[in-house]
Regions:
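Predominantly flavin-linked oxidoreductase catalytic cores and closely associated redox partners
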Residues: 1-42, 67-68, 72-79
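Residues forming anionic-ligand binding surfaces in small-molecule and nucleic-acid pockets
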Residues: 61
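C-terminal catalytic lobe of FAD-dependent flavoproteins
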Residues: 39, 43-45, 49-53, 64-177
Length: 177
């Protein structure tokens, strides 16, 4: 959206909806590792994965939609999750579903990551079309953007930079005291 406001070269971003459901912790031992399906043309396929909290997360679907705010779940989407997950994991306990949700991924029509300075908008760095394995690629994408900015702005390393910080406290693991 922002790219198209500043550049004459237009990107065509398609909202790709992914629906999920989350099972109660009582279902958490149904699988011990992430179970991946074979990926399709729209994404990585439906997976079943234990969460750090002991639940099971199942999804996503992948459907290109028009509505850029369309984060509703649908009966057909949730049924598709169950059917596809059931091909790899038997007897998923649907009675233990505690919530369902959907999110949108920004699919770019060119089917590739776009990480570059917009040619006709100096200083505007695009990071678009980042899909699977986008999460895994995030550190490399960050380094690419840093390199673009370093070269453009002639940045120098700060020898006094402190790259470590204290860890984030998890209140659930703390004692009452």
């Amino acid at each position: 959206r922002f790219h198209n406001m500043v550049s004459s070269r237009k990107l065509h971003i398609i909202p790709r909806k992914g629906e999920y459901f989350l099972l109660d912790k009582g279902a958490g031992d149904h699988v011990s590792r992430t179970i991946f399906a074979l990926p399709g043309k729209l994404g990585k396929g439906v997976l079943v994965t234990p969460t750090v909290h002991g639940n099971l997360l199942v999804g996503p679907t992948a459907a290109d939609i028009e509505d850029k705010e369309g984060t509703n779940t649908t009966a057909s989407g949730l049924a598709a999750i169950y059917e596809k997950a059931g091909q790899n994991v038997r007897d998923l306990p649907l009675k233990k579903v505690i919530t369902s949700f959907a999110g949108l991924r920004a699919h770019e029509g060119g089917n590739d990551f776009i990480i570059e300075e917009a040619s006709d908008a100096p200083g505007f760095i695009d990071c678009a079309g980042i899909e699977s394995p986008g999460l895994t690629s995030a550190p490399a994408v960050g380094l690419m953007v840093a390199d673009i900015l370093r070269d453009k702005m002639h940045l120098q390393r700060n020898p006094d930079f402190q790259g470590r910080r204290k860890g984030i406290l998890n209140p659930a693991l703390l004692s009452i005291e």
